[in-house]
């Protein structure tokens, strides 16, 4: 039985603190693999004659493809990393107010990036005078200027100018933006917040609970149960319709996305506890049991609301959480227990600078559009096409690593 007091808290000694709160290799590797998969599945649109199970399942259909498990895995990993990040900041001396400000500023950054990227999907090139393939690199370059980790030796005036250029560029793009919806010209708006924006809202909910809970296992467990139940209540149409509830972003109000992130936080606390006890077999047993329960919950809820990413159903929440826990467990044994982390060195930049890696494809697609480059049909078809998309993902990781070495590294 796990007691509240014995759940992972900063240990009593400096030595045990350093062991408990060091960077976990398996989490970085899991994040890197997820990022590579995300780039890979996002490139599948360029291919034809590929297995349907690799792609997103259409809205309203009961089922998921590989592409439908990548985003929830990323949300889960956001939660998985949270206790380590918060504890490390506490070790550095951050107050509760500073921790809350950190969560809020990161949330705002993710929302800003998400909104700018999602507006690119509906841009009206004729009305704005700018094609989509120029909008994206301008936005991404601005993100880099604003959130790059500049060397301490850099002149403050130059850093200020770089950040100011990024901010002014984004403001200008937002002012002059023109999009389209149902044959109507639209202006800059949040829309559905985009992938990064949804991550931002889920991060806000799970981050605030993590900060206030101070690693209390039962508060975190209660938070996860709350969002899991909220997901079911929301899909059952039982949420009250009033201005207050409607004002809450759907990524939180719907329960599912925040539930994925909170599941990661809960898993992280369990992981910290058994790792501190050096009980890998106990950790394995608990993770397998937790995954089995989650799969069971997915099976139970699927007949009511289907298993679907588009709709963020409870069954999708439970099943994808189980998949991510099992993947994390396998990688932990391979990388941290068996010391085979070097097997994943080729994708390491995708785990340590994931945001920059996520932005690289926007530049790559822009280059292809500007140059008019076209690959032969054989490279866009079937198995050969899949290999092309996989190599494209690895190329994005390689570029991320090269940019890191050149001094470009993003941190929110």
Model-inferred region functions:
Residues 2-412:
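Alpha-helical transmembrane segments and their immediate juxtamembrane cytosolic regions
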